[in-house]
Amino acid sequence: MTTRIVGTGSYVPEQIVTNDDLAKIVETNDEWIRSRTGIGARRIATAESNSRMAAEAARRALLQAEIAPEEVDLILMATSSPDYCFPNGACEVQEQIGAVNAAGFDISAACTGFVYALNTAHAYIKSGIYRTVLVIGSDVLSKLIDWTDRGTCVLFGDGAGAAVVRAADRGVIGVKMCSDGRGGSVLTCGSRT
C-alpha cells in the first residue's frame, strides 16, 4: 500500500499587485523583478483570512475527489502565517468545511511546508492510522512582509492550495527529505505581533 493524490483545489484572492504597482512604492521595476524571480504579479488578501482561503481550497479539492468532508480523517495545514497562535488553522478549516471526524494540526516549515505536510500524510496513511488526509498549504504573507524592503516584498503573495491524499495500491514510490539550515539567514520574515 502507498498513497496518491485523488483531488486538488486552490484559492487566490481577487486583488492583484503587479510589478509596476510595486515600482510605485519601492525602488524597482518589472524587468528587475522578472529577471531575478520570474514573477510578474502576485495576489494579495484584503478581506480573506488564512483559514478562509484554506477552507475554500479544501472544499474544491474534496469536490474534485468526490469525497465528503465527513470522510476526512486528518487535516494538515502548512502555513507560516496562521490567523492565530491558537486555535490552529487546521482546526479552523475543520469547522468551516464540516470535517467533523477529522483531527488537525498545522505544520510550519516555510516554503517547504506543503511538501512536509504531504510526507506526513503519506506516513500516517502508510502506518494505517488514517485513510484520507487533507493537505493544505496556505499563507497570507502580505500582512507580515516589509513592503519597503525590495528584496522581500517582490517575492510573496497570498493564496491556498489543497490536496486530498488517500491510500492506494499505486502512487508514491518513495520519499526522501532533508534540511540544510546553513542558509536560514538569507531570507527571513519576522512576526508583526
How would you describe each model-predicted region?
Residues M1-A47, D149-T193:
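Condensing-enzyme catalytic core mediating Claisen C-C bond formation in acyl metabolism
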Residues R4, D73-L76, L134, I173:
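Conserved beta-strand elements of the Class I
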Residues Y11, A78-D83, A109-F114, G137-S142, ...:
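Acidic, glycine-rich active-site loops and adjacent beta-strand->loop/helix elements
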Residues W32-R36, G40-R52, S80-V133:
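Conserved catalytic cysteine-centered active-site region
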Residues A57-D73:
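Phosphate/pyrophosphate-binding loops at sites that engage ATP/ADP/AMP, CoA/4′-phosphopantetheine
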Residues K126-A160:
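Flexible, glycine-rich active-site loops centered on histidine and acidic residues
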